[in-house]
């Protein structure tokens, strides 16, 4: 006598659908959380970069500051052909920086491997020479690099060689602590304070968040 084959009941099939549905929903939640974690700003420079990248072609945060000029510059390729890419440039009025600093500028690169923020400013010493601060935040690696070079008035040239820069600073009695204070008064007390005044930041000038900081003069 041939035995009849057992068929799954409708209830078991419905339960299986519910289980598969819950698994699918859970997977979507995990993917969403992972995406949010990856995209979520890890530090104050991330925050500035991402907000600017989202809004720079319209009205965005830096437009709210009174003493800055905001512009977007169209980029060209190596053959000088126009592209659809831009860099955003924020220039501070010298009058907002005090008597010893000039030419503070932020540039945002939104394309390729060099995505990030470049910050430049000049700090004048008592001798009349100027120290150029060159600061770069790399968006992909989450690294902030702080460097300097010297513009020598007598020769009208920039000194970039580290040994020559150190020798120059020693000649005029400028210490690593002085360089830290010059950086602090412009980047922390000006740029980042301004940012926190126009954006509800999770970070602050004294709490950058998760970022690796490489300072050229750290052990000078």
Question: What is each stretch, according to the model?
Answer:
Residues 2, 14-19:
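Positively charged n-region of N-terminal signal peptides that target proteins for export
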Residues 31-125:
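N-terminal export/targeting and maturation segments
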Residues 13-14, 108:
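Intrinsic-disorder/low-complexity regions
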Residues 19-37:
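Hydrophobic membrane-insertion alpha-helices, especially the h-region
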């Amino acid at each position: 006598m041939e035995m009849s084959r057992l068929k799954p009941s409708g209830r078991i099939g419905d339960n299986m659908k519910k289980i598969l549905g819950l698994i699918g929903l859970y997977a979507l939640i995990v993917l969403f959380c992972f995406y949010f974690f990856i995209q979520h700003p890890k530090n104050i420079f991330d925050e500035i970069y991402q907000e600017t990248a989202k809004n720079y072609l319209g009205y965005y945060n830096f437009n709210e500051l009174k003493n800055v000029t905001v512009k977007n510059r169209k980029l060209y390729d190596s053959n000088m052909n126009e592209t659809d890419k831009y860099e955003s440039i924020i220039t501070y009025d010298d009058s907002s920086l005090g008597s010893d600093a000039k030419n503070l500028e932020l540039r945002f690169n939104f394309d390729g491997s060099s995505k990030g923020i470049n910050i430049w400013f000049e700090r004048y010493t008592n001798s009349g020479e100027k120290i150029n601060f060159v600061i770069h935040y790399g968006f992909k690696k989450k690294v902030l690099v702080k460097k300097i070079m010297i513009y020598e008035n007598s020769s009208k040239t920039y000194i970039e060689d580290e040994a020559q820069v150190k020798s120059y600073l020693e000649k005029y009695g400028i210490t690593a602590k002085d360089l830290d204070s010059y950086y602090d008064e412009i980047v922390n007390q000006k740029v980042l304070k301004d940012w926190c005044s126009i954006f509800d930041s999770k970070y602050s000038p004294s709490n950058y968040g998760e970022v690796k900081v490489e300072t050229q003069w750290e052990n000078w």
